[in-house]
From Swiss-Prot:
It comes from Thiobacillus denitrificans (strain ATCC 25259 / T1). It is an enzyme of class 6 (ligase). NCBIfam families: argS. A motif ('HIGH' region) lies at residues 128-138. Gene3D superfamilies: Arginyl tRNA synthetase N-terminal domain (3.30.1360.70), HUPs (3.40.50.620), Isoleucyl-tRNA Synthetase, Domain 1 (1.10.730.10). InterPro entries: aa-tRNA-synth_I_CS, Arg-tRNA-ligase, Arg-tRNA-synth_N, Arg-tRNA-synth_N_sf, ArgRS_core, DALR_anticod-bd, Rossmann-like_a/b/a_fold, tRNAsynth_Ia_anticodon-bd. This is Arginine--tRNA ligase. GO terms for cellular component: cytoplasm. The gene is argS. It is found in: Cytoplasm.
Length: 557
């Protein structure tokens, strides 16, 4: 057995040594868990119950034999048998003291895993159309994506962050028409205002700068407006560059960066879309019907075959999606994760079907998807739906300006991605323990204040005697610290950053309870140094955890 819990691994070695003495060839997959009832010990193993049948022994008797054969150790204070044959382990205080030392020795590396050969993973997120400001749904996606990138990097993966720009669809033409109408002096509501046009104030801003012949620079392009209201192509290019720049500013304010911006339009100019269609035709996975080209996606689990090329000669949107994911695979990303809204659920089966039909070696189930629901924003007990800037929705920039980057990130990560989230602006602004991000950050600030009052050298705590750490609050805190590496691993594996959010809230709760129950800077030097060492270990884990979420750990609040 190999886990990410330091004490579980040590216990596993003891159990394996006992089993080697009793039944060296017996097959067993060790499972060590934390009992729900703390009176049942710190950890529990069902090893005896697993081996009872192959060894033809009574599980309780076998459990007793395993306990008898356990090597002497400073780790286990007592082991007893419960139920049908569970072995419950009660650890020594020294075992938990070791966690404090591990945390303080590892520092920023505590909770991070190393891989001999890091695997590459591409995580695609946000991927908003360059047709308007980022909304709060994009914000949730940005928070999820950035946190997952950090979590995977912490697990030793070589992480590549990518933003896919849908810059080749009908919506871009609508954007250009909207800006052109504004440039001609039209306004939403006018009789000649284009149908389905974008109405937000940002359209007027783009039109004004276009007429002024301004130059705008986005991540990978710079474009100067012609200023000619009849030059629709110039309007289109300027509007896309303008909004890409605006989205870059939003993401920068949210502390999110990308390694690459992949343009949908490049799939056409590079010939990837045509090549993908030709590959599928050559594989015999297509047919023509009613003047359209169809892909046999039902052969790969889809509920019906899908049109690839319409009778007017244009491609449906899922064709460039297939081409894009083939490009991901060919760039060497054996693992790909897409973070999208739940409204994209229907695309999963057809994209995966297209990838399988292409027969390029892509495994089934590629790519992975993390789907999230939208976000409702509340203020003063009422839902906020309209933003003057966007015209019809609350933007990510609105939310950051109304609250803070840290509050937005922490709140949007605090629930499972597919659970609807209500963002309470009043709660995000509260400076009390009801505000979860304040609660966690305040724990860190409290620790910093203790060390400021102490004014000693933290490095001298390396050899502190931790024997005085024996109170219930101290034990609970040390137990929580030990869970951190396992929490990080689970959050990455399950695509579930909310697990880390919940962990940090519990860790902060354990610390606040200890802080309220005990004084740290006491007269007894040994007790003071031990408590300071535990406080420092707690500080390290809070900082590490918040960093993975992209949230700051202020020293003063």
């Amino acid at each position: 057995m190999s886990s990410t819990h330091p004490l579980k691994d040590q216990l596993a070695l003891l159990i394996e040594a006992a089993l080697e003495a009793l039944a060296p060839d017996a097959p067993v997959s060790l499972e060590i868990e934390r009992p729900k009832n703390p009176t049942h010990g710190d950890f529990s193993s069902n090893a005896a119950m697993q081996l009872a049948r192959p060894l033809k022994r009574n599980p309780r008797e076998l459990a007793q034999l395993i306990v008898t054969e356990l090597p002497a150790s400073t780790l286990v204070a007592k082991a007893d048998i419960a139920g049908a044959g569970f072995i419950n382990f009660h650890l020594t205080p020294a075992a938990w003291h070791g966690i404090v030392r591990q945390v303080r020795t590892a520092g920023a590396q505590f909770g991070r895993a190393q891989r001999e050969t890091p695997q590459r993973v591409l995580i695609e997120f946000v991927s908003a159309n360059p047709t308007g400001p980022l909304h709060v749904g994009h914000g949730r996606q940005a928070a999820l994506g950035d946190a997952l990138c950090n979590l995977y990097a912490a697990q030793g993966w070589d992480v590549y962050r990518e933003f896919y720009y849908n810059d080749a669809g009908v919506q871009i033409a609508t954007l250009a028409a909207s800006v052109q109408a504004r440039a001609r002096g039209l306004q939403p509501g006018d009789a000649t205002w284009p149908e389905a046009a974008y109405n937000g104030d940002y359209i007027a801003d783009i039109a004004r700068d276009f007429l002024a012949g301004k130059t705008v620079k986005s991540d990978d392009r710079e474009f100067t407006a012609s200023g000619d209201v009849d030059d629709l192509d110039s309007i289109r290019q300027f509007a896309v560059a303008y909004l890409r720049h605006e989205q870059d500013l939003d993401l920068r304010a949210f502390a999110v960066h990308f390694d690459n911006y992949y343009l949908e339009s490049s799939l056409y100019t590079d010939g990837r879309v045509d090549a993908t269609v030709q590959r599928l035709v050559a594989a015999g996975k297509t047919y023509e019907q009613d003047g359209a080209l169809w892909l046999r996606t039902t052969e790969y689990g889809d509920d019906k075959d899908r049109v690839m090329k319409k009778s007017d000669g244009t491609y449906t949107y899922f064709v460039p999606d297939v081409a894009y994911h083939i490009a991901k695979w060919e760039r060497g990303f054996a693992r790909a994760i897409n973070i999208q809204g739940t409204d994209h659920h229907g695309t999963i089966a057809r994209v995966r079907a297209g990838l399988q039909a292409a027969s390029v070696g892509i495994p089934e189930g590629y790519p992975d998807y993390l789907l999230h629901t939208m976000v409702r924003v509340m203020r003063g007990g009422e839902e906020v739906k309209i933003s003057k800037r966007a015209g019809s929705y609350v933007t990510l920039r609105d939310l950051i300006e109304w609250t803070s980057k840290d509050a937005v990130r922490f709140f949007l990560l605090s629930r499972k991605a597919d659970t609807e989230y209500v963002f309470d602006i009043d709660l995000a602004l509260a400076r009390n323990n009801d505000n979860p991000v304040y609660y966690v950050q305040y724990a860190h600030a409290r620790i910093c204040r203790v060390f400021e009052e102490w004014s000693g050298d933290v490095a001298t705590l390396a050899d502190a005697d931790l024997a005085p750490l024996e109170a219930a609050h101290e034990l609970a805190l040390m137990q929580r610290l030990a869970e951190y590496p396992e929490t990080v691993a689970s959050a990455a594996r399950d695509l579930a950053p909310h697990l880390l959010v919940h962990y940090l809230q519990m860790l902060a709760g354990d610390f606040h309870a200890w802080y309220n129950a005990e004084k740290f800077l006491v007269a007894d030097e040994a007790t003071k140094r031990a408590r300071l060492a535990l406080a420092d270990a707690t500080r390290i884990v809070i900082v590490n955890g918040l960093a993975l979420l992209g949230v700051d750990a202020p020293e003063k609040m």
